[in-house]
Amino acid sequence: MVKETHRFEPFTEEPIRLIGEEGEWLGDFPLDLEGEKLRRLYRDMLAARMLDERYTILIRTGKTSFIAPAAGHEAAQVAIAHAIRPGFDWVFPYYRDHGLALALGIPLKELFGQMLATKADPNKGRQMPEHPGSKALNFFTVASPIASHVPPAAGAAISMKLLRTGQVAVCTFGDGATSEGDWYAGINFAAVQGAPAVFVCENNFYAISVDYRHQTHSPTIADKAHAFGIPGYLVDGMDVLASYYVVKEAVERARRGEGPSLVELRVYRYGPHSSADDDSRYRPKEEVAFWRKKDPIPRFRRFLEARGLWNEEWEEDVREEIRAELERGLKEAEEAGPVPPEWMFADVFAEKPWHLLRQEALLKEEL
């Protein structure tokens, strides 16, 4: 449990970092997380990576039609999930956040059901893959248009303030979203209203193929917070503890009524932007290899090993548990069966109007 706040200064020139490349502790305060918590963070990162790998298998075997690889984002996404109160606070995610969804507690059956458009999908197969949502966990259904979820996140946070619920809205997005008008409008309004919101940029340096340095003249995305009059934090997003502590501090700051923050978590996506992208056309292999050496999972593994919290036997046990969970979740999603065609007419009106009833009848005749 985090015992203090205000540990970090905003607008630093270098990313905030707590774990060194060899796993050494760099913090100027004592680590106050218990061993089981640290192990859970690592397990969730492994699960996120293994889920990402399973999604790749789904696309290559023709079982789904689209994926947005997130390998390299694990530390950032798991940290966000652990920094909030699941099922109480709200999350407004973006399309690469399946690791965040899993760490938050969305069942694998639902995640796979959404990817396969089976009856296991709470959205009833109406969204394209990589667009999960969870009413139970206050996980806003992913929206495709870039940054379009930022104004709703601001609005939700304002309502939380007016109703004095004590909740916080956390909104995530990629670096490309920061070039959209909705992004500026949403954060500006949240700042003006002093809303309990935390806006988190998972900056992987590319908006599909466009280098973020070609999108903005601002030295960092965190620096954009100056325009809104809110604090902006630049963080090594491949450092799970730095990401956790900074996001946690921003969340609790918002919960105390001190307004929103902007957090830039610098990460690197190891795969293409999506299954429809060839990243070799715009990223040199040497660049990818450089960032591979900074993989957040081995880095945190070294940190745990130095504290006697990791060994190869424990790692294999954890991997086997995750493999079994993935197999079970996928099996349950597939066995749920495809969504029936008539579901497309449900949940549109409280009472179906005549024209929908007529269309439904015509469809049944054709089938």
Curated annotation (Swiss-Prot):
Give the UniProt record's GO annotations in the biological process aspect.
branched-chain amino acid catabolic process
InterPro entries noted in UniProt: Alpha-ketoacid_DH_E1_comp, DH_E1, THDP-binding
Source species of the chain: Thermus thermophilus (strain ATCC BAA-163 / DSM 7039 / HB27)
What catalytic reaction does the record list? N(6)-[(R)-lipoyl]-L-lysyl-[protein] + 3-methyl-2-oxobutanoate + H(+) = N(6)-[(R)-S(8)-2-methylpropanoyldihydrolipoyl]-L-lysyl-[protein] + CO2
Q: Does the keyword Transit peptide apply?
A: no
Q: How does it assemble?
A: Heterotetramer of two alpha and two beta chains. Directly associated with ODBB in the E1 complex.
Question: Which SUPFAM superfamilies does the record cross-reference, listed alphabetically?
Answer: Thiamin diphosphate-binding fold (THDP-binding)
- Recorded E.C. number(s)? 1.2.4.4
Which family is annotated?
Answer: Belongs to the BCKDHA family.
Which GO MF terms are attached to this record?
Answer: 3-methyl-2-oxobutanoate dehydrogenase (2-methylpropanoyl-transferring) activity; metal ion binding
Q: Please state what the protein is called.
A: 2-oxoisovalerate dehydrogenase subunit alpha
Query: Upper taxonomic classification of the species?
Result: Bacteria, Thermotogati, Deinococcota, Deinococci, Thermales
